Structure formats: structure tokens, C-alpha cells
Amino acid sequence: VSPVVTFVVAVLVTLGSSVLLVTRIERVGARLGFTEALLGLTTALAANSPEITSAITALARGQRDIGVSVVLGSNVFNLAALLGLGAIVAGRIDLHRRVIVFVGGVSLWIAATGLGAVTSVISPITSLAIVLFVFFPYAALCAWPGVVRRLGVPPRTTKWIQGAISDEESELATAIHPRRGDWRDGTVAIVALGVVVLASVVMEHSASSMGASLGWSSVVIGGVVLAGVTSLPNAVAAIYFASHGRGSVVLSEALNSNNLNVLAGFLVPAAVLGLGHPTPPDLVVAYFYAGLLLVALSVAYVGRGLGRLAGVVLVVGYGAFVIAVST
């Protein structure tokens, strides 16, 4: 069987199983009483399982360029497709400034730390510790918003954080409304996760073979082909929410997806397997991700959202990224 046919079949199986996994995870989360923010974070992790698995597979095989570029290339695609294309289709994505600072601040912290790991300025293990130092409290606040009152922070800061979480929760509550699941949903989720992992491994292997036969570089295989294909479901969902005025949902989906990619798909395996010396393609992908994220958040904060022009800028930025890694 040709690598192209194997790749296409693996992609279809991966995406189909991912959709099934996400819906069942949502139902299980509803049964367990997850907050809307935690449910969104959990489903983002489930939705990211293809790119995370592909990245881990590549790093385990010693294909650093593919492993790094799948994760960070997917993040560049998310910014362009979820935020950029979403703003173009919807006309405008309105965003609460507190949500931009709260969620965006965590994303900038993780992106900067990931950049430090890619460039070997910070070791993977140290980078992982730095990211977890911020991500654990963020996840805890998503799960138990009331815990902020017991952290000993000033009352004014407590009120601000609670307001940011409330702004995010208010939109997520209307966007995420799964029925309460049972043991059958949990069983289906476990089976779907296994299928996603196996199909993603096949997808990464076949993409590498296909790219080699076509003369593509490893960064094109990982940062453009695998990254774009595995992120398509997130893009479709984000465009839907953007067109229905759920701006905070789009921002949370894009940034939480990116955060989990860096954490689970890059830093955790890098801390275990090591990274070696940075290569020029790795640096191009990493700098494009950090730069486009900074542009997106800055424009969103100043304009209290993203209009069509901002969306075009992000999409053009992705086009420049594709050209840069392809030459």
C-alpha cells in the first residue's frame, strides 16, 4: 500500500475517532460535574490527541524537526484558522479584556518557555517545571474558581480573577452543553483514545515516508501537513462559535489547545527523551508561533476583539510561515 493511501486512511480514522473521543469526554465531564472552563480544557486535550501523539512518535523516533514542528506548526495554524479565519467569517470576534489577559497571559508564559526550550536557552526539564508552575494554578482555577479566595492574594486581584473566570464561563456555558454520560461513554472514550493513538502513529510514519518520496523537508511534513490536518476539527468548531458571537470560546479553544500542545506534545516528551541541538527549521517554527501569538493578543486587547482586518493579518502571517518553512 502506498504511503499516500495509508496517510489518507490514517487521517480519516484519526479525525473520526477524535470527534467521538471529544463528545464522550464532554459527557463524562458533565457527569463528574466539571466546571465549563475545566470541561473546555479537558475537551481541548482530547481534541489535541492526534497532534500530541504524532509529535511524541516523531520525537521517540529521533525525528526532532517533525516532532517540534507538528506541535508548534499546529499552534501557528490554530492562531490563523481559529482566530484569523474565525474573525474573517464572523466579521468580528468580540472579547473581554480580562479573558484576554487571563488566558493570554498563561499562553505567553508557556510560549516563551517553549521557545527557550527549542533554542536550548532553557533545558527541557527546567522548561517543563516553569510551565507547570503557572499551568497547575490555572487548571486549578478552571476546576475550582472559588479556590482563588484561599490563595492569599489581595482582594482586588481576587475580584479581577473571579471576573475573568466568570466572563469565560458565561460564554462556555452556552457553547458547551453535553448530556450527562454514563459508563458506556467512558468505555467508548477509552476505545476511541486507543484508536486515535494507533492511527496517529501510522499517520506520522506514513507522512514521513510520503514526504521523503516527494522530496519534502521534515519541517514541511510536520509543521504544515501533519499540523494542518490534525487541527482541522478545532478550526471548524472555532469558526462555528465565532459566527455565533462566542468570542471567548474561540479564544479559549485556540489558546488552551496551543498550551496543551506545548506542554503534553513537546515539553513532557522532550524532558524524557531530550532534544539535542536546535536546527534552523525548528527556530523558524518557534519564532513564528511566538510572534504571531504576540500579535494576535496585542491586537485583540487594543481592539477588544478581532475584526476582519486583524483576521487577514493572522492568515497572511500563516501564509508567510508556510513560505518560510518551504524554502
Language model: regions and residue ranges:
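Hydrophobic alpha-helical segments, chiefly the membrane-spanning helices
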Residues: 1-327
